[in-house]
A protein has these predicted regions:
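Nucleotide-activated chemistry modules centered on ATP-dependent adenylation/adenylyltransferase
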Residues: 1-4, 9-277
Length: 278
């Protein structure tokens, strides 16, 4: 089973389900983003969790395959996927990882990799109208985008993934992990993209989601206070500013396209196209 593993809450919980409940071989994938400040911590976290699993559950040594690491900068941009992402973002903004994750899968011929998308996740809300449940050969139920919606941008973007945590939220994961005795392992996970002195910042998107979805205890108290004011004063402005920026970019593109159709006066001769403005 292919699993996108980051060392985070959702993907680690899914790893534990696959290894300790379903007992199936797992190939974990990690896409390294050199611009992300948390990359080193994420890799160290996964290494610690894998070592703990091998020590505590001997059978996982054979089931958990070596992590496969690829670099985001090596992913070739795919025009169809980029167009689908632009279309989806007109309705709901989702992160840049959905530009390179599906492109990576397409580039490497991966047509079923599990993602830890869960209730309260933006992607869960996007996929829900197009979702279908299916029986996985490994003996569990999962969710993916129904091929009957192949004409939609949602299908083009998410067709490579399955979503086994589709019907559970972070608190549900917390309860299930405690019931299984996995609480200590889950506390080893990492989620912050921009750590401050090695601790969660409280301001990045994963920190905000962690707080708002019921796991505020995982963020240091001082950063929770800062996050409170950030979420009430600054965060509400991000979406309208993003929309304004996209609108201005679109208008500039249309003006640039119009100018490229005009004849150039002199220089290269009549009818030569203008260079696009910088």
């Amino acid at each position: 089973m292919n699993l996108l593993w980051t060392g985070g809450w959702d993907s680690t919980f899914r790893l534990l389900q696959l290894l300790l409940v379903h007992r199936v071989p797992v190939v974990p994938w990690y896409l390294e983003d050199p611009t992300r400040a948390s990359t080193r911590i994420e890799l160290q976290t996964m290494s610690r969790i894998a070592a703990h699993l091998r020590d505590a559950f001997a059978h996982t040594g054979a089931l958990l395959r070596p992590i496969r690491i690829a670099t985001v900068t090596d992913v070739v941009e795919d025009a169809d996927i980029a167009a689908a992402l632009r279309e989806v973002r007109r309705r709901s903004y989702i992160g840049s990882q959905y530009a390179w994750l599906p492109a990576f899968c397409k580039q490497h011929g991966i047509d079923d990799i599990e993602l830890g998308v869960h209730v309260d996740d933006k992607v869960q809300a996007l996929v829900r109208p197009y979702a279908m449940e299916f029986d996985h050969p490994a003996g569990y139920r999962s969710v993916r985008v129904d091929p009957s919606h192949s004409a939609t941008p949602e299908y083009r973007l998410f067709r490579y993934f399955s979503f086994p945590l589709f019907h559970v939220d972070k608190l549900g994961i917390d309860r299930e992990a405690d019931a299984q005795g996995w609480g200590g392992i889950m506390d080893m996970t990492w989620f912050c993209h921009t750590p401050v002195r090695g601790r969660p910042c409280g301001l990045c998107a994963p920190c905000v989601y962690t707080i708002e979805e019921g796991l505020a205890r995982r963020v240091p108290p001082s950063r929770r206070v800062l996050s409170f004011f950030y979420r009430r004063l600054a965060l509400p402005l991000k979406h309208p500013l993003r929309q304004l920026r996209a609108s201005l970019h679109s208008r500039a593109g249309r003006r640039g396209s119009g100018r490229r159709d005009e004849p150039r006066r002199g220089g290269l001769g009549a009818g030569a196209p203008r260079n696009p403005p910088p």
